[in-house]
Curated annotation (Swiss-Prot):
Similarity comment: Belongs to the methyltransferase superfamily. RNA methyltransferase RsmG family.
Enzyme Commission code(s) on record: 2.1.1.170
Location relative to the cell: Cytoplasm
InterPro entries linked: rRNA_ssu_MeTfrase_G (IPR003682), SAM-dependent_MTases_sf (IPR029063)
GO cellular component terms listed in the entry, alphabetical order: cytosol
Entry binding sites for S-adenosyl-L-methionine: G73, L78, V124, E125, R139
Record's keyword annotation contains Transit peptide: no
Organism field: Citrobacter koseri (strain ATCC BAA-895 / CDC 4225-83 / SGSC4696)
Catalyzed reactions: guanosine(527) in 16S rRNA + S-adenosyl-L-methionine = N(7)-methylguanosine(527) in 16S rRNA + S-adenosyl-L-homocysteine
Gene name for this UniProt entry: rsmG
Designated name of the protein: Ribosomal RNA small subunit methyltransferase G
Alphabetized UniProt keyword annotations: Cytoplasm, Methyltransferase, rRNA processing, S-adenosyl-L-methionine, Transferase
Length: 207
């Protein structure tokens, strides 16, 4: 599996240390093992997880600005755990409302010795925003409108929302609330992944 990960990283133009690669592999191993009992993801094949979960998460890393991030609706830690491995200088709060997912995240934190994540069980609209975050990240979480409605209290003054999407959600972008605007749309390339991937970066409008 390490050889496959190395090939995928080369194709994506991403350079990681051997330690980071081993951490990503260990995370996939844990996800595969726990998935049998906890049903954390519909992806069953570890090699497929490398593409659809690991690479699909870390290709957004170069586009994140800041040091403090919150991954809302993180599920089994996607994209937060892969991002925390490739960006050890940043801190990621991993938020999910389901206890079984948060238990898995805490076990990953323990076994991989990840000191830059904080797993939290909470509904996003009930989670306090102090201190505010530099970035709010979502992957397969909700529509842009719902994401902004539920998470608008989380970013700081210069914070951003980062929504990982498949096809470009043109209708969702067109119907953004007036208090927000799209800063950029990045077309992401994920090796061996079928279909399009886009990162929509949204900023609150200054009043």
């Amino acid at each position: 599996m390490l050889n496959k990960l190395s090939r995928l990283l080369d194709e994506a133009g991403i350079s990681l240390t051997d330690h980071q690669k081993n951490q990503l592999i260990a995370y996939v191993d844990m996800l595969h093992k726990w998935n049998k009992a906890y049903n954390l993801t519909s992806v069953r094949d570890p090699n497929e997880m490398l593409v659809r979960h690991i690479l699909d998460s870390i290709v957004m890393a170069p586009h994140l600005q800041g040091e403090r991030f919150i991954d809302v609706g993180t599920g089994p830690g996607l994209p937060g755990i892969p991002l925390s491995i490739v960006r050890p200088e940043s801190h990621f709060t991993l938020l999910d409302s389901l206890g079984k997912r948060v238990r898995f995240l805490r076990q990953v934190q323990h076994e991989l010795k990840l000191e830059n994540i904080t797993p939290v069980q909470s509904r996003v609209e009930e989670f306090p925003s102090e201190p505010p975050f530099d970035g709010v990240i979502s992957r397969a979480f909700a529509s842009l409108d719902d994401m902004l409605s539920w998470c608008r209290h989380l970013p700081g003054e210069n914070g951003r929302f980062y929504a990982l999407k498949g096809q470009l959600p043109e209708e969702e972008i067109a119907s953004l609330p007036a208090a927000f605007s799209v800063e950029s749309v990045v077309k992401l390339r994920v090796p061996q992944l079928e279909g399009e991937r886009h990162l929509v970066v949204i900023k609150p409008n200054k009043i």
